[in-house]
Amino acid sequence: KIDNNRIFLVCLLIFMLNMFKKYTSALNFRTLISVIISLIATWTAYKYNLSFNLDLTLISIAVVFPLVFTLGSAFQRREKALEHLGRAKGSLAAIKYIFSVSKAPDVEKKRIDDQVKEVKSELIKYLYSESNDKEALNISISNIKLFIDKNKEFLGRSISVRVYRLMRDVIMGVENSISIKLHRTPQTIRAYCELFIYIFPFYYAPTLIYNLGNAALGFEIGATAGGSEYFDTTFLVYALNVIISFILISLYNVQEQIENPFDGDGMDDIQLENYELEY
C-alpha cells in the first residue's frame, strides 16, 4: 500500500511538472515586459482620468490581423517541413531497399546503408545547429550520387531511372527543409505586431475604465427595484488589461517558437531524432 501511494505521488508530481512546463513554455522576458506595460498603462489612465469609448477595430487590425497571419504562416511552415523531411527520408529508404535486393555485392549494400544513415545524420545536425555551414551535408549527398553512378550496372535500365528520380526527391526534400530553416515569415510584420502589442494597453485601459466605471464613481451591478449595489472596479480593470496583453504576447511567443521548427525551442518543434530511425 505504501508503494502504491509512492507511485501515485510520483505520477502526480510528473504530471504536474509536465503541465507546468506545458503552460509556461511560451513565457519569456517579453511576457514580463508586457505585464509591466499593462500595469503602467492602467495606472496612467487612472492618474490622468482617461476614460474614452474608443473603437477597438483599429487596434484589432494592427495587432490581431498580423498576429493571426504570422501564426498561420508559421504553422504552415512546420507542416511543410514535415512533408519535405518525410519525402527525403522515404526516398532514401527506397534507394537503400532497391540496392538491397539488387545483384550488388554485400560490401556495396552495406556501404549504401551507411551512406543513407550519414545523410540523415548530417541533415539533422545541420537543422539543429545555428550554423549555416552545410558542407558536410552536401558531401554526404554527393557520396550517394557517386555510389549510384558507380553501381547502376547492378540495376536494370528502368530501375536506374527510378533511382535517379528518388535521388531528385531526396535533394528537393533536403533543400526545401534548408530553405525553411534559413527564411522566416515576414520580419517587418512581426516587428510591428510586437510594437502594437506593447502599445495596446494604453489604448485599451481608457476603454475599460469607460465601460466598467471609474474607481471614484463605482460600477453599478445587480440593480433592482429596491436599489443598486456598487463596487470599485479598479482591480477588474487592471486584471483585464493584464490578461488581454498576456494572451496577445503569449500567442506572439508561440509564433516565434515555431518560426524555426528545427531549433528545439518550443513544445511544437519537430522531433528530428525520429527521422534517424530505420524502418
Tell what function each PLM region has:
Residues 3-5:
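Intrinsic-disorder-associated, low-complexity terminal segments enriched in Asp/Asn/His/Tyr and depleted
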Residues 9-86, 217, 229-234, 249-279:
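N-terminal juxtamembrane/topogenic regions of multi-pass membrane proteins
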Residues 87-90, 94-97:
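N-terminal pre-first-transmembrane
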Residues 180-186, 213, 254-262:
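Alpha-helical transmembrane segments
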Residues 191-212, 235-250:
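Bilayer-spanning, highly hydrophobic alpha-helical transmembrane segments
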Residues 209-236:
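Membrane-interfacial helix-loop-helix connectors in multipass membrane proteins
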